[in-house]
Amino acid sequence: VGNRTQISQKTVGITGTLQAVDKAGRKSELAYQLSKASSEIKRDMEHILLSNQTASNGTAGSTARTLGGLQAWLNSNFDGGSGSTAGNLGTTARVGGTDRTFTETILKTVIKEVYESGGTPKILMVNPGHKQTVSAFAGIAAQRYMAPSDAPTTIIGAADIYLSDFGSVSVVPNRFMNANNDCNDVAFVLDPEYAAVAFLRPFQTNELAKTGDSEKTQLLCEYTLEVRNQAAHGICADLT
């Protein structure tokens, strides 16, 4: 069982004039642009790692190699709508079914399955909308901190920890879980000990051919999703 590596890269171009003039707040324009490109690549990576993309060897000169995203790996602890099927080993994509409301019962089922499979469910990763849904689960009522009459009070309208029968689960919102990577209708139950980002080539820069007065630099990395045991995680799918 293994995954494929994928390359993510950005190219920045700096003109001689821009590099030579005084720049407020920074010494090197190249360093500044590479820092921005690094942040962009990291966002792209997170988007891909959580996706329903399948692993592929690609074709030399035409089709890029791709890694298998998290949704395409999770199979054992899967709770989906009618007609849905789970992904498998990074080579088979998850197939969506009939959408249904994200309920506490669905979450409890997947947490229990992860625990029974030997995992320790520690993180519930959700999109912003589902974060608000979890905060409204039964048992979480509106509360106020006790405070002196001359001090403001705090209204508690969020749940950051879900105390399950099998331990505390941190509820983590992720803005990169959206329709663009098929994450708008899923929630992940994760054991972080059994998943990681593995690098074949860490972040590195390559000087490219100069075009006129513009110097170009490529920033790239080659990486993959390392799923050490897919049964240590779970997925709630087809959620509204």
How would you label these PLM feature ranges?
Residues 1-240:
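Flexible, glycine/threonine- and acidic-rich loop/arm segments that mediate assembly and lattice contacts
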